[in-house]
């Protein structure tokens, strides 16, 4: 005996599959621009650091770099706003976890407490950015 499918059942199954596919594409479409937005944020941060004003005192140096750092995080949250639900929360979680790494001279340490020297920030900066972007890319691929 076997299962007999007439045209109605096949059409219903196809309609459900197409509806699921359309919903998945719509959800994925919301995140289409997230990598472009995130890369734009990184480029903007890089440009700010490259055009960093010379000859400032230490306090002004730290304040300037921390402004760039906070602008980067604001830009990233904006890029994630239209993405799938929870992406902004995941970014905030990654940010908090990165603060807990306690890397001496990191931007989290430097900008969170207002202490430190501008010279100690440069070695940790690229490592931190790569770690954050790799974690974000890994999370968004699932």
UniProtKB/Swiss-Prot annotation:
Chief place where the protein resides: membrane
Signal peptide (residue range): 1-27
Alphabetic keyword roster: Cell membrane, Glycoprotein, GPI-anchor, Lipoprotein, Membrane, Signal, Synapse
Entry-linked InterPro entries: Neuritin_fam (IPR026144)
GO biological process: neuron projection extension; presynaptic modulation of chemical synaptic transmission; regulation of synapse maturation
Intracellular or extracellular location(s): Cell membrane; Synapse
Pfam annotation, one family: NRN1
Record lipid sites (GPI-anchor amidated glycine): 116
An example Gene Ontology CC term for this record: glutamatergic synapse
Membrane topology: Lipid-anchor; GPI-anchor
Pro-peptide positions on chain: 117-142
Domain of life from the UniProt record: Eukaryota
Single GO MF descriptor: identical protein binding
Role summary: Promotes neurite outgrowth and especially branching of neuritic processes in primary hippocampal and cortical cells.
Known partners and oligomeric status: Component of the outer core of AMPAR complex. AMPAR complex consists of an inner core made of 4 pore-forming GluA/GRIA proteins (GRIA1, GRIA2, GRIA3 and GRIA4) and 4 major auxiliary subunits arranged in a twofold symmetry. One of the two pairs of distinct binding sites is occupied either by CNIH2, CNIH3 or CACNG2, CACNG3. The other harbors CACNG2, CACNG3, CACNG4, CACNG8 or GSG1L. This inner core of AMPAR complex is complemented by outer core constituents binding directly to the GluA/GRIA proteins at sites distinct from the interaction sites of the inner core constituents.
Family: Belongs to the neuritin family.
Protein name: Neuritin
Native species: Homo sapiens (Human)
Species classification: Eukaryota, Metazoa, Chordata, Craniata, Vertebrata
Gene name of the record: NRN1
């Amino acid at each position: 005996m076997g299962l007999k499918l007439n045209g109605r059942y096949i059409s219903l199954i196809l309609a459900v599959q197409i509806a699921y596919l359309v919903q998945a594409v719509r959800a994925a479409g919301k995140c289409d621009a997230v990598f472009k937005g995130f890369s734009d944020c990184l480029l903007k941060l890089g440009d700010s650091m490259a055009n960093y004003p010379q000859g400032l005192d230490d306090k002004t140096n730290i304040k300037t770099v921390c402004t760039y750092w906070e602008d980067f995080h604001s830009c990233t949250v904006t890029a994630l706003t239209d993405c799938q639900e929870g992406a902004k929360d995941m970014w905030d979680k990654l940010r908090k976890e990165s603060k807990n790494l306690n890397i001496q001279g990191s931007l989290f340490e430097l900008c969170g407490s207002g202490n430190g020297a501008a010279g100690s920030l440069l070695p940790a900066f690229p490592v931190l950015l790569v770690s954050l972007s790799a974690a974000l890319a890994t999370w968004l691929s699932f």
